[in-house]
Amino acid sequence: MITCLIVDDELFAREELADSLSQEADIEIIGQCSNAIEALQTITKEKPQLVFLDIQMPRISGMELIAMLDPDTLPKIVFVTAFDEFAVKAFDNHAFDYLLKPIDADRLSKTLKRVRKDLTPQAVNLIAPRSLEHLPCYSGSKLKVIPIQDVEYVFSDLSGIHVACTKGKVHTQLTLKVLEEKTPLVHCHRQYLISPKAIAEIELLDTGAEVTTLLGDKVPVSRRYLKSLKQLFGFQ
């Protein structure tokens, strides 16, 4: 059984695809998501083998969602799009699976045959954005899209990944690895990433240092990262 997730902001498109997939005996639809934040949470929690992903979604596009996923746990992606010459060309150049809206039954059947033969995730990072402009976050039952320039630092603990921004603290499903690779945030501690632009002061301590951010928060700096952090500002 192949577990799959459908991600599309259009309800009719999701239901139409789900109806077609429900006729396949070896496909189990584990969920449907209407936006990238819901999709990131579901992919992280449920770990579907296959994701049908609409690339033209508001605020955070399907391509941006790809950039947010950890390459080590990436599912097989089938892109879904209204005709977009440049996107289709990119998909063809890299031999990625894609479906054009409205989805043709024969095309879907051929795509599923290829997927059944090979569930190995593609190197979709080749066409994903190199950096993130927004972070998908949540606060209680509210989903939030935080501009990366509003983020002062992020940190991890047993309850997850926390984002400290100009409007308070929220949570994200993004990993520290993805955040370090796709944003201007840099390591200052094993459990912390910080925006250099948010640093107001660095106080040197016997055990490392402590940063005071522009909003007045205190962030630890371990000895391991102190030198590289100082060098960002021209200190030796």
UniProtKB/Swiss-Prot annotation:
Signal peptide: none annotated. SUPFAM superfamilies: CheY-like. Residues 3-116 form the Response regulatory domain. The keyword rRNA-binding does not apply. The modification 4-aspartylphosphate is found at residue 54. One of its GO terms (molecular function) is phosphorelay response regulator activity. Residues 135-235 form the HTH LytTR-type domain. One of its GO terms (cellular component) is cytosol. Disulfide bonds: none annotated. It holds the Pfam family LytTR. InterPro entries: CheY-like_superfamily (IPR011006), LytTR_DNA-bd_dom (IPR007492), Sig_transdc_resp-reg_receiver (IPR001789), WalR-like (IPR039420). Keywords: DNA-binding, Phosphoprotein, Transcription, Transcription regulation, Two-component regulatory system. One of its GO terms (biological process) is regulation of DNA-templated transcription. NCBIfam families: PRK11697.1. This is Uncharacterized response regulatory protein SO_2823. It comes from Shewanella oneidensis (strain ATCC 700550 / JCM 31522 / CIP 106686 / LMG 19005 / NCIMB 14063 / MR-1).
